[in-house]
């Protein structure tokens, strides 16, 4: 086993030296590539500071953005090509150190690069070289998830919790507070879940198995522990600020705040267990672990009671909304005042007091406007009575009366206002139930004669005139059938048309001109029957010239030209 491990170390050292020689010859960024290869070699020890300083200088704000992008690309290529857990872990340590101690522009460039491709995606990474490598590979995957969540938290918060300088609330106070203490309710509900998710990934970096005693993993775990203190401090200050604003929130915000408060209590217990596990490691000598206290559970009951009575909506903001109603300023007082007919239809403001002993007054007779109104419920006119015949006869006498068209005829309003717009399709669905009913009052001629009645009189006269018999001519038989093709049967089509209609072309014409024996047979000439179904089922017979019978088969006649089942001679 020891010989195999020694061989693997020698093979790794050979690969590192070969890689360094290649990048010095082929790379444009030779110094940067050499520093990355030496900082992430196969030796199980933390990256050296001299190599890290070269990488920090290549990603500083004074360098071009192309140099920073090349450094990120080189680290990503180194991370995804290796299958050794030591190289992968040391590459993640370099990235973590750059996030903590590097230039702020590096975080922005790394965030932009991660949006195009997940640089820290190591969910399928596994080193099968030894059983110890299995446990170390599992911790490498967990560590990569923490760094990825740290980058996502930076995207939400727009600042780094580790690089943040905690200001002091009072001049004489030693301990400062984070930015979450001064956030408003909306920002607080957005940033606290991101911080809690980062703390969840941090607690998951607890080493297990053979990874507990590896000094490279403990070096990376020390970086994680340093960040846990400020992350917990930011969450704790945010919870205090959340409690102060809780009773001013709406119901949906209060429910979200309650979930954050419950999760904060659970994570406090999990973080305490994580600290207890780290106290047994060698790195515990360099840390002073804080004492964590869970949020009081009594306040949790108060929050649940408030949610039951919390308002469902928030107050309407003072600023105008996007869709607001504004009255039309272009309307004048004449347009807004009702007309005389509308005043009659509006209810009066006078209140008549009627005693219980007096009988109610009879209803007033319907007005002329109400009589002209058309009931839209009776669209078919089933409830409308037949018009009086005497009235129609009196109106027919004035059908041809001349009426002056100088003055425009009054149009019925049907209880509509003066500014009624008939072009609206919504109003047309209601006010125009049928074309016949709505236009009945508009078809009035002089004297009140209806145009439909006048048209029906003319139609009746035209029908009676057409039914009168003409003397001297026989009446046509309505049951006689006429052949539409009778006029074209007696005329032979042109030769071009015959060639088109003949499917066998010139062959059949040549065959027909050959003399063939015919048999004597007295056949009846075809009669011209107008019935198109008279000869149904018979074969068509073409008249041919009678030739003498020389075959000796008697008088049995066979017409080879007209047999549709005869042989064409093609076989």
UniProtKB/Swiss-Prot annotation:
Pfam families xref list: ANTH
UniProt organism field: Arabidopsis thaliana (Mouse-ear cress)
Alphabetized Gene3D superfamilies for the sequence: 1.25.40.90, ANTH domain (1.20.58.150)
Domain of life: Eukaryota
GO cellular component: clathrin-coated pit; clathrin-coated vesicle; Golgi apparatus; mitochondrion; plasma membrane
Keyword annotations from UniProtKB, A to Z: Coated pit, Cytoplasmic vesicle, Endocytosis, Golgi apparatus, Membrane
Annotated GO biological process: clathrin coat assembly; clathrin-dependent endocytosis
Record's protein name: Putative clathrin assembly protein At2g01600
Keyword Hydrolase: no
Bias-annotated ranges (Basic and acidic residues): 337-346
Domain ENTH: 24-161
Record localization: Membrane, Clathrin-coated pit; Golgi apparatus; Cytoplasmic vesicle, Clathrin-coated vesicle
GO molecular function: 1-phosphatidylinositol binding; clathrin binding; SNARE binding
Biased composition (Polar residues): 523-532, 543-571
